[in-house]
């Protein structure tokens, strides 16, 4: 998180007259990579056009095409397009910098796929730049996305598996592999994920969310990928664009969906455009460093000052992460096309948007609407990190907000539930409002949300302390959490390693980012253990690689979690059913998922004593239920007052009406 806002800001939104003063961090390390091979076109040289973005486009798209063209003095040129009917220049927009043009291109309905040529003319001289207009995949616009039927597996690629050691350190990229450093690059890559897709499928996951894979070429701490230096290229230490598309294809072959993590809010201070931005207000500029105040309530607080709102949405996320100005229509169009380009080019299934409330909310609503206009069934989940339920609900599209705002954001991350799970499960002698009652209380506020099915529920991710640490390294509590993730409303996300109770390396504390993002044992040649295999899990013991369980416990946790999520895949009553829950008693919690055909009963004993299930308390829904099956054992289950549930354990029973 960034530091409190500094004084002396320029208050206007369109700050075109100020001198751009940059922190010098990382600019020297920025490398500008041409978007094409200049040798491929004899009369186009790299000093005339250094890049054109988007890199390509398609016929049959709803989004009008606007090309960002960069080249020294390019604004002095006229632009036309040749190569066939149906593709033409509609308008040429000049920027503040003479080294950019924004060219509006019409791709008519009769345009044919193929290579066209952008012709740049000046003083009787001209040169050409090849540009591909491809045919869309059949059914691309109607593509499906992640839903309540999915379980999402979150991977931090640098820490998952190293499938290609040859790209660990790359010339021109100063941050080299250093596996002994918690904030260094460890060498995980796209090939490593491809190599372990079977493990992910075996766990029961149906979708993968990777933290950003696009280029982050700052001098240090680049492993996380959240400071982009080139939006259209995969970081070479992870692979390349073609390998990323292969990864998506191979995942689809195994019925795994791919969700891309994107960050329109901020770019790296070493991004290629920072040496010469198209417009003076391309990003938010202050006379001294000004971080966001992170007061998200200013977006919906009727009493908030404009000053506080401005600093919240315009302040920088970090000194190395500049805040993009989405109020500039060319910036907004850039990010709309960029998102659509990756969906179409790589065949993506969803987006996770980082730091969603940091953005200017109205342009981001337009961004969401543009993506949904192109792909009506596409899903986007936004990271709106707040434990205030009304504030969280405000960001979900379709909500009847008093100010009339509609984000068009379909899905949100359930941070209130995340915090309630972690706090409640470790309170063995709870007072009023504590223990498992915390979870009951969170669900009692479900009336606030517009669409409960589009809630991402999660017990941990790459930004929060390891689940194993939060639950005090108690595997029974981990099992309770996994059972709740598999049976509650919404769709679950599990952070890689939590299914094995990874813990932080505790470099400073359990919440330290470098420490909690531990390497997955078995992902590197020479690792002492391989937790990707059943044999490796069975033999796993305490070590220094983020695992702290007795021998055999890793296998037990994995098998428990895998069984649950494999079972969940086909349970429509979980995906789309209603919920009925009952007030907690003695740190126990009972809830039912039900529809016209099926009922699933979940009983959580979070106490330190065995408990008899109070069936009469649940008569409203349980009366008459017969022929139950214990989900974990497959054995028949009958309602009986003699049923005892062990301390810190969970019972799941399914019935057919």
Question: Where in the sequence are the language-model features?
Answer:
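Substrate-binding/active-site clefts of carbohydrate-active enzymes
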Residues: 160-345, 364-374, 379, 384, ...
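Beta-strand/beta-sandwich contexts
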Residues: 34-76, 129-138, 142
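Glycan-recognition surfaces
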Residues: 374-460, 519-539, 548
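Low-complexity, Pro/Ser/Thr- and charge-rich linker/hinge segments at domain boundaries
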Residues: 133-154, 159, 163
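Immunoglobulin-like IPT/TIG beta-sandwich domains and homologous Ig-like subdomains
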Residues: 61-124
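C-terminal motif of bacterial Sec signal peptides marking the signal peptidase cleavage site
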Residues: 28-29
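Loop/helix patches that line or flank the sugar-binding groove of alpha-linked glycan CAZymes
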Residues: 163-181, 185, 386, 452, ...
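C-terminal beta-strand-rich structural cap/linker in extracellular carbohydrate-active enzymes
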Residues: 638-657
């Amino acid at each position: 998180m960034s530091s409190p806002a500094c004084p002396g800001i320029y208050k206007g939104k369109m700050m075109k007259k100020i001198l751009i003063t940059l922190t010098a961090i990382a600019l020297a390390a920025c490398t500008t990579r041409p978007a094409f091979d200049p040798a491929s076109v004899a009369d186009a040289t790299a000093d005339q056009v250094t890049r054109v973005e988007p890199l390509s486009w398609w016929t049959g798209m709803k989004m009008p095409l606007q090309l960002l063209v960069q080249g020294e003095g390019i604004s002095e040129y006229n632009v036309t397009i040749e190569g066939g009917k149906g593709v033409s220049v509609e308008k040429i927009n000049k920027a503040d910098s003479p080294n950019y043009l924004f060219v509006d291109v019409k791709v008519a309905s009769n345009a044919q796929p193929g290579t066209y040529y952008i012709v740049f003319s000046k003083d009787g001289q001209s040169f050409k730049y090849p540009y591909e207009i491809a045919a869309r995949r059949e059914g691309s616009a109607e593509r499906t996305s992640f839903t309540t039927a999915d379980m999402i597996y979150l991977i931090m690629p640098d820490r998952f598996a190293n499938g290609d050691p040859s790209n660990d350190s790359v010339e021109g990229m100063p941050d080299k592999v250093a596996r002994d450093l918690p904030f260094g690059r460890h060498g995980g890559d796209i090939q490593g994920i491809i190599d372990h897709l079977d493990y992910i499928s075996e766990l029961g996951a149906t979708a993968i969310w990777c933290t950003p894979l696009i280029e982050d070429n700052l001098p240090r701490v680049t492993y996380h990928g959240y400071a982009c230096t080139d939006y259209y290229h995969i970081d070479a230490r992870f692979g390349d664009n073609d390998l990323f598309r292969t990864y998506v294809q191979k995942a689809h072959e195994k019925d795994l969906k791919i969700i891309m993590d994107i960050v329109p809010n901020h770019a790296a201070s070493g991004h290629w455009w920072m040496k010469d931005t198209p417009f003076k207000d391309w990003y938010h500029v202050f006379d001294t460093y000004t971080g966001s105040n992170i007061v998200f309530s200013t977006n919906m607080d009727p009493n908030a000052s404009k000053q506080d709102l401005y600093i919240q949405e315009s302040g920088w996320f970090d000194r190395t992460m500049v805040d993009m100005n989405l109020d500039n229509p060319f910036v907004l169009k850039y990010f709309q096309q960029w998102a659509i380009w990756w969906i179409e080019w790589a065949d993506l299934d969803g987006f996770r948007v980082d730091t969603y409330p940091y953005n200017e909310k109205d342009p981001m609503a337009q961004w969401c609407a543009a993506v949904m206009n192109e792909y009506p069934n596409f899903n986007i989940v936004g990271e709106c990190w707040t434990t205030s339920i009304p504030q969280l609900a405000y960001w979900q599209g379709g909500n009847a907000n008093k100010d009339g705002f509609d984000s068009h954001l379909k899905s949100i991350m359930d941070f209130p539930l995340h915090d309630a799970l972690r706090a409640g499960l470790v309170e063995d002698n709870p007072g009023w409002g504590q223990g498992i009652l915390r979870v009951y209380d969170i669900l009692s506020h479900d009336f606030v949300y517009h669409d409960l099915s589009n809630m991402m529920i999660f017990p941990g991710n790459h930004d929060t302390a390891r689940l194993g640490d939060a639950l005090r390294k108690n595997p029974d509590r981990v099992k309770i959490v996994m059972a709740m993730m598999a049976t509650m409303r919404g769709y679950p996300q599990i952070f890689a390693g939590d299914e094995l109770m990874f813990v932080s390396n505790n470099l400073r504390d359990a919440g330290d980012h470098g420490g909690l993002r531990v390497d997955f044992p078995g992902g590197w040649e020479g690792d002492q253990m391989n937790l990707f295999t059943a044999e490796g899990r069975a033999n796993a013991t305490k070590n220094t690689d983020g695992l702290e369980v007795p021998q055999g416990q890793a296998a037990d946790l994995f098998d428990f979690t895998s069984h649950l999520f494999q079972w969940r895949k086909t349970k429509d009553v979980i995906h789309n059913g209603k919920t009925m829950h009952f007030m907690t008693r003695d740190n126990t919690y009972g809830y039912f998922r039900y529809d016209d055909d099926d009922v699933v009963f979940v009983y959580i004993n979070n106490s330190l004593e065995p408990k008899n299930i109070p069936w009469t308390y649940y008569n409203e829904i349980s009366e008459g239920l017969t022929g139950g099956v214990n989900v974990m054992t497959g054995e028949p289950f009958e309602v009986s007052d003699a049923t005892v549930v062990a301390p810190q354990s969970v019972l799941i029973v399914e019935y057919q009406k």
